Amino acid sequence: MVKKYYSYRALPTSKKVREKRAKRQNVTTATQAEVNRRLRMENLTRLIMENYEAGAWYITYTYSEKPTDEKAVLAEDAKFKRTLRRIYRRAGMEARYISVLENLKGRGRPHGHILIPALTVDDMERIQKAWKHGRVQVKLYGGGAEDAARMAAYFTKEKIDGSSGRIQTSRNLTRTPVKKERVTRSEAYREESTPPRGYR
C-alpha cells in the first residue's frame, strides 16, 4: 500500500536548528479529531490488508436483551474471545483478530464486531454457540483494498468512537513498519506532460 502526499512543512536538515514542538495547550479541535480519525482509519486499513485474505469472517454478535451495565459487556466479550482462541488452537490456527464493541453507552443494545480468519463450517457453528447472549451473524470479507478501507472506516466511524470501547487487536497480527521516503521537488512533478484541451 503506497500513499503519496504533499507536505508544506519545511524543516532544516540539522537537528540543532530544528524548532522544538510547543507544549500542548488546547483541547483537540473537531478538525484535528477528524484528522486523527482518518489516520486511525488508514493505519487500520493497512493492518487489515496485511493480515486477512478474501473469505475471512466478519462476525457481528448481539444481545437479545440489554445487559445490566458496561462491565458485564466487557467481561462477556473477553470470555467470548477466550473461547475463540480455544476453537482456533484446536483447529491448528492462531486467532488473529480485530474487534470493536459498539453502543456501550448508547440507548440501544450493545453489540460487537470481530474480523478473524475463516475456519470450517463446523467451527463456525461452535463459534455461534459460544456466544450465549444473542445472535451471531457471519459475513465474508471481500479481501480487496476497497473492502479493507470500508471495514476500517466502519470500525473508526465517529458514532463508534463516541459511544464504544477502543478497537482491540490481537498481539499476533503482522505489523510491518511504515516506510517513509522524502520526495524531492523534481520528483514531485508530473512525469508525462499533458497538453491543454484543443492542442496536440
State the predicted function of each range.
Residues 1-108, 118-200:
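Right-hand nucleic-acid polymerase module
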